[in-house]
């Protein structure tokens, strides 16, 4: 019996080794991995196992060359080759990398899925284990805050559009009794863009109401407040420090449209303004969660506001909305945004190119025409950030041998 148990453990280890190495040399990772791409140029694609075992996730599995070679010999993917002396490995020349064309990029986007609802303390291995029977996953990106805290959501790339669609279309998927929000990546971004557009429309409408209200003092505000009675839901409890407004949108996504959330991260209570009656949204959400409506796995007290408490809260929300609108106006609204993002270079070019009459724009300026280099197009725009290419399935930056990592230990991540 003990021998059977050992054999099962070894088989599981070998499967993990194959999966990890085949990820390193796979279609998704290899084109993005600068270090590994440099290594395969040195010796006809061969990479020494001595180098490979310095990759952190493989190192945690094994450093034994024989175990690695034995594992790869049992792989059914036929992606990797082992050298005759069993000291080097390479991606099989018969399996060339796909050409990274626009068509290929679109194909990757079409089989990328957004999944939200994981606890913030979940690890990459936890998520990989949960996804094991959901289809073949080529890459997992754990989405993080600016402070590197896991946000509880991921982007996963499936091996085919069919497997991605099958996963997205499967209803009622949960992670440890927590309902998950699952969308195609493109649908997720479309949803976020629609929310931004809706916010702009609401801001314009609010501005119009305020303008009309100045001619009829109190009438517009009174009608607006009366129309929102019964739409406020107060929540309180020992909330997670990472709780954010998006969590409430997720919780009530199919039960009621949220118009405003009076809440700041780190607070223990707040108020949600629904478009329709808050009681209906609360009952629907409770029913969908078997009567136990948790927020990031924390117990929460939910209360529909009435009477003076409701009027006071509505007045505060109205004032906050007006303040937000005023700030937006003070920045110039659309005019201010014309100088942000993709068009910011137009102002800068005034000082970089030739001045009037072919003269330099300023003293000491280089002669010649200042040329805009174009917007940078990223293949993987999940985080919408610039910086080193990430090794997504590790949830870290690309791995390099420990010797190189030691040269930059001032705040660098664990490799």
UniProtKB/Swiss-Prot annotation:
The record's subcellular locations are: Nucleus
One biological process term from GO is: tRNA export from nucleus
**Pfam families under this entry?**
La, RRM_1, RRM_3
- Name all HTH La-type RNA-binding domain ranges: 7-99
Predominant place of localization: nucleus
Can you cite an annotated GO cellular component?
cytoplasm
Output one GO MF annotation: poly(U) RNA binding
Q: Does the keyword Phosphoprotein apply?
A: yes
Q: Which residues carry this modification: Phosphothreonine?
A: 120, 377
Q: Which UniProt keywords apply?
A: Acetylation, Nucleus, Phosphoprotein, RNA-binding
Q: For the modification Phosphoserine, which residues carry it? A: 92, 94
- Modifications after synthesis and translation: Phosphorylated.
Feature: compositional bias, Basic and acidic residues: 377-415
Residues recorded as bearing N6-acetyllysine in the entry: 116, 128, 327, 356
Q: Which residues form the RRM domain?
A: 111-187
The Basic residues compositionally biased stretches are 328-341
InterPro entries named among the record's database cross-references: La_dom_prot, La_HTH, La_xRRM, Lupus_La, Nucleotide-bd_a/b_plait_sf, RBD_domain_sf, RRM_dom, WH-like_DNA-bd_sf
- The record places domain xRRM at 226-343
Q: How does it assemble?
A: Interacts with DDX15. May interact with RUFY1.
Q: What does this protein do?
A: Binds to the 3' poly(U) terminus of nascent RNA polymerase III transcripts, protecting them from exonuclease digestion and facilitating their folding and maturation.
Question: Can you name this protein?
Answer: Lupus La protein homolog
Q: What is the lineage of its organism?
A: Eukaryota, Metazoa, Chordata, Craniata, Vertebrata
